[in-house]
C-alpha cells in the first residue's frame, strides 16, 4: 500500500473528488499544511511514495504574490524528480512542477474560469485522457513547462492544460476533482477573489456530474502513469 505526501496551500482546496478514487485503490495520502504549521514543508523523508502539490487560490509563483513556501517546495519537488518518485501538480502545484523540471511560470491575474480542454494525442495519460473534458481553473499565474515536457492537453486558448514531465510526473492547470464547494470556500477564505464569480459558480454546479464522469478515466490514467498501483 503506497502513501502520497500532499502539500496543501489553502484551507479550502484539497484533493476533492480524487480522495475517493485514491481510497478505493487503497492508496493512502497525508496532508501537509505549511500555512498552518509556520511554513513547515515536508523534508525528503516525508515524501513517502510520491508527492502531490495542490492549488493555491490567489497564491502564485511568478513574483506577484508568491506562495511563501515556494522555494522550499521547488527544492522538494526536485528531490522527488531526481529520485524517481511520482509527482502530481495541480494549479499552483503544476507551476511548481514546471519550475522544478527546468521550465518557468508567467504572471497572470487571479482567474476563475470554467471551460473545456482537449487532448493532444490519443495515447495521452496512457490512453485514458478523454478527448475533451471540463477544465476548472482557480488561481494566479501560468506554468510554462520545459521543452522536454509533453503537452497532453490544451485549453481553448492553446495553453497547456495537462503536461507530463519524464515518465511519472504530471501537471494539471485545473483541478480535475474540484467541487463547487471548494471554489466557494476559496472565495470566502481570502480577501482577494474573482470580480464576479456567480455565473461561473452556476456553470460549475451544472458541470459537476460531467467532472465526476471525466475523472473516472483521468484517474485511471494518473494511477497508471504515476505507477501508483505497482
What are these regions, as identified by a protein language model?
Residues 1-5:
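Extreme N-terminal starter segment of soluble prokaryotic enzymes
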Residues 6-7, 54:
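Short hydrophobic segments within beta-strands
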Residues 7-9, 34, 92, 174:
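Cofactor-binding loop segments of dinucleotide-utilizing enzymes, especially the Rossmann-like FAD-
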Residues 12-17:
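Short N-terminal binding/cap micro-motifs at the start of the first secondary-structure element
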Residues 20-88:
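Flexible gly/pro-rich beta->alpha loop and the following alpha-helix that scaffold active-site loops
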Residues 79-104:
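Catalytic nucleophile loop
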Residues 99-181:
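Pocket-forming structural segment of enzyme catalytic cores
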Residues 178-230:
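Acyltransferase
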Amino acid at each position: 500500500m503506497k502513501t502520497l505526501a500532499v502539500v496543501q496551500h489553502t484551507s479550502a482546496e484539497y484533493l476533492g473528488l480524487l480522495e475517493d478514487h485514491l481510497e478505493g485503490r487503497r492508496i493512502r495520502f497525508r496532508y501537509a499544511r505549511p500555512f498552518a504549521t509556520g511554513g513547515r514543508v515536508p523534508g525528503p523523508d516525508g515524501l513517502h511514495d510520491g508527492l502531490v502539490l495542490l492549488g493555491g487560490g490567489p497564491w502564485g509563483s511568478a513574483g506577484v504574490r508568491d506562495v511563501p513556501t515556494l522555494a522550499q517546495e521547488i527544492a522538494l519537488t526536485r528531490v522527488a524528480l531526481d529520485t524517481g518518485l511520482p509527482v502530481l501538480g495541480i494549479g499552483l502545484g503544476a507551476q511548481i512542477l514546471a519550475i522544478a523540471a527546468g521550465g518557468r511560470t508567467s504572471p497572470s491575474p487571479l482567474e476563475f474560469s470554467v471551460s473545456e480542454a482537449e487532448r493532444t494525442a490519443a495515447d495521452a495519460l496512457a490512453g485514458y485522457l478523454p478527448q475533451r473534458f471540463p477544465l476548472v481553473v482557480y488561481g494566479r499565474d501560468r506554468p510554462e513547462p520545459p521543452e522536454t515536457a509533453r503537452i497532453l492537453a490544451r485549453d481553448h486558448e492553446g495553453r497547456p492544460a495537462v503536461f507530463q514531465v519524464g515518465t511519472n510526473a504530471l501537471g494539471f492547470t485545473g483541478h480535475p476533482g474540484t467541487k463547487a464547494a471548494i471554489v466557494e470556500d476559496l472565495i470566502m477564505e481570502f480577501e482577494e477573489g474573482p470580480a464576479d464569480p456567480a455565473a461561473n459558480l452556476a456553470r460549475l454546479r451544472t458541470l459537476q456530474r460531467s467532472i465526476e464522469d471525466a475523472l473516472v478515466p483521468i484517474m485511471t490514467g494518473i494511477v497508471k502513469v504515476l505507477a501508483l498501483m505497482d
